């Protein structure tokens, strides 16, 4: 995909990077300073703003509604988002673990028929903009917004007492931006990224998957471990993942494992190796059923389908081996139902 920087005379650094997913939608777009990757002008777009962590069913509803509204108006679609959680800058608190990496988020937004994603360079200066200033400087002047679709519970800009949707409509009228409110079709499901994080932190991947509208995924690179699984006849791929990515609660899970365009059944353990390593190190390791190849250095994606059991301590290796055989049988059964 093409990536361009968006400049603004109001800031000393580009206000955003735009990831163009559908180049045909921006035939009239202009790129300045050829070769520098900066000064890209989109033209007129329909946009929506949000962090979109997880791109769950509520987000999908907003994005698909934006697609419909944009086509009715003959506009390209743009999702405006952030690389880091705004809370970490605005409130100076630690950001929650992410349901999606930035790359995953961009790809999932693209699956909702969005033409481009603008990732804001959310500086302290940008955080001080009021909603009206944000709409003018970032959305209208910077990104060319002509239509803005707002989620039913979304707000942006430096908080202002009693500011509401009617104010956004008024600001938009002054700036030449049509502002609309997305309907509440998904609201009754009480969808939120926070509720999905909580479910995953409890190990309830099945319920989390329902709210996501797909299976939760974690990707990483296979690194060398202690090879204890190999000694038991269950060799595992130990994954090193993005440290900001949320990992489900400790325990064992039935997973699909994606590797080089292929999919394999797998049983994944997230734990502290209580039996073999005295609980000193958290690990994420997967045994691929009916698979023999060496995966060191390879990239894998785990698709979490269901929880097998809690983390537990075993009296010895034979007890652990018996449990792993039971886990494998249960994994096959669980995945067969998920086909």
What are these regions (language model features)?
Residues 1-45:
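Positively charged, low-complexity intrinsically disordered leader regions
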Residues 3-4, 225-339:
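Phosphate/ribose-recognition catalytic cores of enzymes acting on nucleotide-derived substrates
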Residues 4, 117-119, 178-182:
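General small-molecule cofactor/ligand-binding pocket signal
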Residues 38-101:
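N-terminal catalytic cores of NTP/NDP-binding nucleotidyl/phosphoryl-transfer enzymes
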Residues 88-175:
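N-terminal Rossmann-like or analogous alpha/beta NTP/dinucleotide-binding catalytic cores
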Residues 170-271:
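Glycine-rich, Lys/Arg-enriched anion-binding loops that position phosphate/diphosphate groups
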């Amino acid at each position: 995909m093409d990536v361009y920087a968006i400049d603004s005379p109001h800031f000393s650094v580009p206000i955003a990077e735009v990831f163009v997913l559908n180049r045909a939608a921006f035939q009239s777009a202009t790129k300045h300073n050829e070769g520098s990757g900066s000064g890209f002008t989109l033209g007129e777009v329909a946009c929506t703003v949000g962090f979109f962590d997880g791109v769950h069913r509520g987000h999908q509803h907003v994005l698909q509604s934006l697609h419909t509204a944009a086509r009715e108006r003959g506009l390209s679609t743009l999702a405006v988002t952030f690389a880091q959680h705004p809370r970490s800058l605005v409130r100076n608190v630690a950001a929650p673990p992410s349901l999606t990496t930035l790359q995953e988020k961009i790809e999932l937004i693209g699956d909702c028929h969005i033409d481009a994603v603008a990732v804001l360079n959310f500086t302290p200066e940008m955080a001080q903009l009021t909603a009206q200033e944000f709409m003018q400087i970032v959305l209208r002047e910077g990104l060319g917004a002509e239509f803005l679709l707002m989620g039913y519970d979304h707000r942006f800009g430096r908080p202002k007492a009693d500011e509401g949707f009617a104010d956004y409509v008024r600001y938009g009228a002054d700036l030449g931006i049509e502002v609309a409110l997305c309907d509440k079709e998904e609201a009754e499901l009480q969808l939120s990224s926070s509720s999905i994080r909580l479910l995953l932190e409890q190990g309830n991947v099945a319920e989390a998957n329902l709210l996501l509208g797909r299976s939760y995924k974690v990707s990483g690179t296979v690194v060398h471990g202690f090879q204890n699984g190999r000694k038991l006849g269950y060799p595992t791929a130990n994954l090193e993942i993005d440290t900001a990515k949320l990992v489900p609660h400790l325990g064992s899970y039935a997973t699909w494992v994606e590797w080089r365009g292929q999919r394999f059944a797998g049983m994944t353990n997230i734990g502290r190796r209580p039996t073999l390593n005295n609980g000193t190190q958290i690990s994420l390791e997967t045994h691929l059923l009916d698979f023999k190849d060496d995966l060191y250095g390879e990239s894998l994606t785990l698709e979490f389908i269901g929880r097998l059991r809690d983390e537990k301590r075993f009296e010895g290796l034979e007890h652990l081996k018996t449990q792993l055989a039971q886990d494998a049988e249960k994994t096959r059964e669980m995945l067969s139902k998920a086909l």
